[in-house]
Amino acid sequence: MTPDDVTADWLSNVLGGPVDAFTTQRIGDGHIGMNLRVGLTSSDPSVPESVVLKMPSPDPTSQSTAAMLRHYEREVKFYLEIADTVDIGVPYCHHGEWTPDTNDFVLVLEDMSPAVAGDQVAGCTLDDARAAVLQLAALHGPRWDDPTLSDVDWLSRHEGQTSVDQLKVMWQMFFPGFAATYRGQLTDEMFGLAEAFGDHIGTWAGERSGPMAVTHGDYRLDNMLFGPPVEAGSPLPRITVVDWQTPGHGPPIVDLSYFVGAGLLPEDRREHERSLVALYAEGLATYG
């Protein structure tokens, strides 16, 4: 699917109502996909004013990476098969399809504007973090230790030698860039710990145990859209979580630790991390 394939007839078909005219605008900075905001003109009030389309990147290398990691397949299948079984806020999916033979895909999603994407470099407020961990509980809680998830073969799992080998390759690819960027900001002890981890990936992956749930796999501020509070007077923003290219079946604590460790500035994390974990646990408790 490319922008040239988007026509009024195609949009009318997938949205279930006549589209008389449309406009397109490239949005976001996706590395392995392309995002378009499509403005719609229709005589049918059931047709939204705009939608967001996700489709493959025009870059062949990005397409190959996405195919190897099953990103396109997993994102489409998350929206079609998993999204309705969990409570986390996601854009409504009007249409989704993925073609196994070509790895082509398209998603037609609710346009969440004027919600604003988070910034993992700038960090977030405490209220933003509270809303994010509650949304995480809404992802994990509904299918906590659900045995039927073992039958969902397209969910990412870091188990088995093949998965461990993939993790090792990714480590070798990305660690040099990490070291070049952050070495000067880390103590010798911290950097040594990070450097040594590469030799112990297999042990780390093999020893993880405990409850399992649906996981996001990349739960960071850049993948969250922040909007007005759901309830009037609430300090907590409405959060919509996007970029479901890495959904998995694994330890839910990984999503939580990744967000708390990377979402807040260090001084804020040190002060509030325990209360955020406690709030997450409270959110989980509502699911039994």
State where each predicted segment sits.
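Juxta-kinase regulatory segment immediately upstream of eukaryotic protein kinase catalytic domains
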Residues: M1-T24
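ATP-dependent phospho-/nucleotidyl transfer catalytic cores
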Residues: A115-H216, F226-P237
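Generic, well-ordered alpha-helical scaffold segments in large soluble proteins
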Residues: I82, L139-P142, H200, D218, ...
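Active-site acidic catalytic loop and adjacent metal/ATP-binding pocket
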Residues: I27-S42, V52, G198-P252
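Active-site activation/catalytic loop segments of kinase-like enzymes and analogous catalytic loops
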Residues: K77, T246-G288
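Conserved ATP-binding subdomain of kinase catalytic cores across diverse folds
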Residues: G28, I32-T41, P45-L167, P252-I253, ...
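Short amphipathic beta-strand and strand-loop transition segments with alternating hydrophobic
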Residues: A21-I27, H94-G96, A196, G202-T203
